[in-house]
Structure formats: structure tokens, C-alpha cells
Amino acid sequence: MDDTKDEKMSERTFLRQVKKQDGGRQKFDPLKIERCISKSLVDAKVEFTQERVEELTGDVVDILYDMKQKCVSNDSVADAVKKVLREVSMDAYDAYIIVRNRRDRERALRSPIIKTVREIKHADLPSSNILRDNANESGDTPAGMYGKIASETNKMYNLLDNVSKKYAEEHTNGYLHIHDLNMYDLTFNCLFAPVGKKLRTGFDSGTGFQRPAQTIQSAAALTAVILQLQSNQQYGGIACDNFDFELAPFVDRSFRRNLAIQLNAMADYSEDPAFAQYLQQEGDADIEATIKRITKGLAKDGVSMNTPTTSLYFLFPKKCIDKAIAFTDCDTHQAMEALVHNLNSLQSRSGNQVPFSSLNFGLDVSACGRMVSKNLMRAQYEGMGDGLTAIFPILIFKLMKGYSFLETDPNFDLKQQAIRCLARRFYPNFVSVDSTFNKPYVKYLTKTIEIGDPSLFTAKVRGKDELVHVERVEKTEFPIYEYHIAPDDLWEVVDFDGKTINLRKLVENTTVATMGCRTRVIGNVNGPEQTTGRGNFAFHTINLPRLAIESRIAKTSEEDRIKLFFEKLDGMLDDAKESLVERFNLVCMKTYKTFPFTMQEGLYLTSDDKEHELSDDIAEVMKQSTLSIGYIGIAETITLLTGKTYGVDHEVDALAVSIVKHIRDFCDATQKKTHMNWSCFATPAEAVAGRFATIDAKKFGDNKKLADINLQRIFGKGYYTNSHMMDFSLDVSLDDKIKVEAPFHALTNAGHIFYYKLNGDLTKNVEAVGAAIDAMYNGNLGYFTVTMDSDDCIKCGYHGIINNVCPKCGCKDEKYFIRVRRITGYLTGSPRKTIKLSWNDGKVKELGDRHNI
């Protein structure tokens, strides 16, 4: 190329760049174009001179120059070359296409997505964290592999195209974790589903309309369907916040049907003319029609199993009542048994997992509600096939004085049953409605009436046998959307002076509930402060140890380190907030059409307040949800900042609390500014615990400025400790652990959990389990449980602790051992997959260290 032409090209291409396929940029070099043209002509066996090649190169440069851009894409350069070669020789054009396609293929095979797909399809399960990032998803099945490929592909797409560059880099580099990145642009996290509402009205399942439930069996079956359908339109957990209240009306329907059957049977041989109405009538097509007619009449007359049996005996033969109650109890047990089995077998999300379901219960003191609670726990206690522990649903028992905590409370016996069930089957977990940060949200209907009012009905006085007549209340003094009002017999007489009666009735869905993993909603700046029909939209987690590492490297004095740490934390809080808002706005562009069950069937609060078009976006509805900022690694953070051990050196515990309070204060301030529901979250950290630790170990593991601290305590474990939990390997008493961790529960209004591990076979030490639960309740914890090791040998049926050999049959083959363990809030354990085949590396290492959880 002569100097004049080269100078002309340089002038035209001054400061011009080429944007590569991977997004990077490089200086524009005409000589590369010249070499491509020359090679294409050679491959096509076209005769040419150097001058001709330089001329063609100049033509390509002219095309690019005419684009008037300082930076052109790699594809634009290729298109220009193809255009010039096509005019010279189609053979040369084809030769260039072949070379370019080969390079594109080689480049594609080196791409991250192809490497990930190879790992998913070909890696050995124990060596792949991608296949084990969720302990209850099967990454080695066809559906599991398919789901993982789609998941990992959408993660990469979102990082490149949807997440702002700054937040994408913070996620990739381990400052901030964007949870469920695979679903970032598609949907929301979790929901407390209004199951009772859909059981009463029926619903469209997508392939047909499901009729309203008429019995407890059909209600339980449809509950599983509702939870499965909703699970497919979100990515997180699905829960019922008051399962006993929701299902109790259908127990009553079964009772009336069973009573109708008994009355019909008695009418066959009774000479009492009053029983003639229970015989088959001329208008009844068959016996089923007769039973339906009788059942309908009983409902119209207000006959209920919640009515004291002594009163029912005045209306119907005692034998009929007793049998109807007994058969209803049997029906309820079978219904709960079927529900547990269905929720462990109905596959959702492309057949890769069952719904991550949770059922909150324990406060319904009616006969029907108590029957639901009793039989749900009975089904859990009995286990599934071969007596194995059910992984789902996660059962959560609500503790509340006056209802289910004290010995004098009507549901105290259910609390005792819950403790026995926990000792055998890990569940229920417990939630305290009475904790100082939960109790203020509880609401009651109240009414003061005078004796002699004409519109009266009977209400039971708590703890007494006599009945008091009180007025039926239809309205309340606070706004109601869809509050669930307890049955009439659940009115409490607060006081009675002989003339005036003061009453109250619990509005049960204002009592706290939680997802099994710990996520919850509480408070609402955009609607009623209820749980039903609401959920968490999304949460992002801040890597606190990373900020502490950088602060320790930068500053030598403890005071300066802590000051810098909080400055860095402020920056990350802003980024966490903005990244969540960005995510929220993206998903809220989706329409009712995208969510045929959630929105069109009215599961989300306010989604059916008015008529909606399928093209309407979901932004207004999603304002009922919460946005949460989580954190991880308080234990490691305190060590890095002070050199001391959190929970042992108590002088640094206040610093730990101040860090989380700083996050909570930020969330509260953001809520006021944005008028959105913001909350502080104690992150469960299943996959992120190992991910953050691995990234930080690679980056800082050999940093000389960290030589004065025991890095084995930080990086050697292979994971960071969950949220504010104490180091799992510490030998600490229950009381001490409560004192250290309880203050965080008041701060983490997006969710939290407390565990304490008891050793041995807890079925032989139920009293210790009960004492531990009471201590947690009295320690002002919000959500808590006892955890343990639980093993089963499916070869001989032994249950207990199995080390390497079954104590009963001597079996040494691990494939016969079911080792159920609690991974975060939920369980994992299967006869097909050992812990090492289902837990990621970080969680496997954590399991080996566990001493106090």
C-alpha cells in the first residue's frame, strides 16, 4: 500500500474503533481487512494483484467511513467486506462466508453459555455446583438439565441486556448478589395465596373450571392444585398464612354431609315422623340427591360442628352426631394425608421440582379448625411411604397467648402435638405472634353491646362452659379489603358486668405468617396490613465480609476501619435499592395476560378489585408486595473489622447489631421516600454462602495486608455464615445463642429464623424440645425451631442416628440410608440422592461444621 493511500486511510479512520462480539473494543486496523480479502481471493482461486487488494480494502474503508461513526461493530465490517467481495467474485464471497462462519463457530464454542451447557450435560453431579445450587431441584434428570440450561442462559442474558452494567459487575464480582437472576425479568418471588377464597369461588385452572369445594377432601385436593398452579407463575415459595381458618369451613361441610348420611340411615328404621324428612323424597333422583338435599337443609338451618355437642344433642340423636363427628375426623385425616403426599409428588416448573409450600396454622380454636390442625400434624408425624419424612409442606405453628401457648389456652394440646411432631419429623417450625415486633400488627373486631338487644347470637366465653348472647357484628372500625373473619363462636368476651358485654374477635390474617425459608411480609403502605394475597417481590443480598475485607486492607486502626466500612455499606445500600427498583420496573411492564392464574384469578391482593384488560400492566398490583435488602456474613465481618469473635467476645455484639440496624434504617427511610414497601432481610444464603466466600478467597486469600488475621476462619470454611447467625462450629448454649441473635429478629422485618441443634433421638426427649421452644418464644424471637440429625434405614425401617452402619440390621450401604437435614428453612433428604449429591459445596462444608444448628 503506497504512503499516500495509507495516509488517507489513517485520516479517515482516526480514533475509529471496532466493537467486538464480546462487547470489547479495539482500534480499527485496515490491514486486517486487507488480509481477509487476500485470503478469500486465494481460497476462491481468483487471480489478483496487491494493488487490487489495496483497492478493495479502500472500498471497504469508504463504506465504513460513510457511516459517520467513531466506532463500528464487527458485523458492520463483515457486511462491508461481503458487499465488496460479492461485486468481485461470488466464489471469493463464499470463501469469506465459510471462513467467517468457522470463526463464529469457534468463538461460540468458547462462549460462557456453551461451557455452562457442557457442564450441565456432562459434568459428574458431585463436582458441579450448578447442578446442586438448589437442594430440592434435580439437576441430573432430563427435565432438570433442560431447566438448568434455560436458567443459566437467562442469567447470562439478563446480566448482559437487562441489568445495568454497574449492578451486573457488582453481582459478577461478588459485592451484591441478585437472587434468582434466571427469573429477573420474568416474575416475582413468593405469595401467601388466598386459598380459602379460591376454594369458595372455584377457579379456572387453564384447561377447565374447578368447581367450589364441597368437602374437606375436595378442598385439600384443590389446595394442592392451587399451590401448584401459583408456583408455576412465580419463582419462590408459596404459602397459606392461616391454613386452619382457610380449611375449617370445608370440614363443616363434610360434617353436615356425614350427619345427613347418618340421619338418612336412622330414618330408615325410625318410627318418629320427624325423621320422614330425611328419607328419599319423590323429587330426589337417587340417594345422592337425598343426601345433598338434607345437607343443604342443615346448612340453611345453621347446623355446624363448631356448635357445642351438648347443644347439637338437643337437635339430633346423640348417636348420629357422634358418628358424624367421627367420620368427619376420618375424612379430614385422609384429606390431610393426601395433601401431604400431593405436595411431595405434584411436579411443577417443567417437572423439575414440587412447590416450595408452607402452611401456617394453630390459632383457630373452633372445632373444625382444630380438626384441620390436628390431622395435618398427624399426617406429617406418620410420614409418607415407607414411613419417610415429608419434605414439603413446611408446617409452621403459630404461638399466641390466649390461643395456643399457655396451658389454659384452647389450643395448648395442639402445641404439645406440634412439639411431638417436631421431635420426630423436623416440622412444625414455630412463629411467635406475641413477639414485640409482631404483636402491634394484630387486629381485632370489637363491639360493646347491651343485654336485651334483639339481634343476638351465642358466643363462647373463653375458658368457661356457659354461653353468652351477643350481637352479630358486620362492620369494623378499620379498613377491610378481604380480611378473614373468624366464625361466630370465636368471639371472646373481654368483660361482662351483667349489663354490658365487651367483645373482640381475632382478624387472623393480620397475625404474622412466614414462608418456611423465612421470607415474610408485614406492614403495608399501599393497602391493608394483611398477609393474605401478598408476598415478597425480590431481594438482593450485600456481601458484608467483602466490605470489611476492603476496609481492613485500607485502614490500620479499628475505628477507621469501621468508619470506612459504613461508608462502603452506604454505597452498596444505594446500589441494592436502585438495582431492585430497576428489576421491579422491568417486571411491572408485564401484563395480566402473562399471569392468567395470579392476576386473572385474583390471587394477588387488589388484582380483582376492578375490571382489568389483559393488556393492563401489573404495576399497581405489585405495589402490595415488598422489596427487600439482605445481608450475609455478620460473623466474618466482625472478625475482619475487630479481630474478635461475634457471639463470644460480647463487646463486639453491639457493632453487629448496629450494622443490621443501619440496613433497617435505610429500608425504613427508603420506604418513606418511595412509598413502596421496603424491608430488611436476614438472607437464607443457600447458594450465595459458598459463592461469595469462593470469590473473596480467590481475590484476597494471599493479600499480605490480611496477614495479621486468621484467614482460615474467613476463607478456610468455604462458605460465609448465614445472615447474623453465630459461627456454626461454636459450642454455645441455647440461652446464650438466643441472647446474641434475638435482637436481629426485631430488625429484619423481611424475614429471619433461629435454629438450635439438639443431639440424639429427640422422640425420647420430647420435654427438652418443648423447653427449647418455650425458651425461644420467651426470648422474643420471631420464627424459630429445633433442628437435629435424622436418619432412616429403608432396608429394615430403623429410625434414629446412623453413622456408617445401621444399628438394627448392620447395613453399610449408603444407598439404603435416608439422611434428612435442614439446609436453610426447609429439609432435604431422599433415597435417591445423598446430601453430597444435592447440596452445593459450601453447604456440604457448613454441614460438617455445624454444632449449634
Where do the language-model regions lie?
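Conserved catalytic cores of very large enzyme subunits
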Residues: 106, 112-623, 644-645, 649-822
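Long insertion/accessory domains within large nucleic-acid-processing enzymes
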Residues: 807-853
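Short, solvent-exposed secondary-structure capping/transition elements
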Residues: 45-49, 73, 90-94, 551-555, ...
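Conformational switch/transducer regions in large eukaryotic molecular machines and scaffolds
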Residues: 29, 41, 47, 804, ...
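Short, hydrophobic beta-strand segments
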Residues: 16, 60-65, 357-358, 636-643, ...
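Charged, amphipathic alpha-helical regulatory modules used
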Residues: 2-120, 843-849
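Contiguous, well-ordered alpha-helical segments that form the cores/surfaces of helical PPI scaffolds
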Residues: 627-640, 661, 822
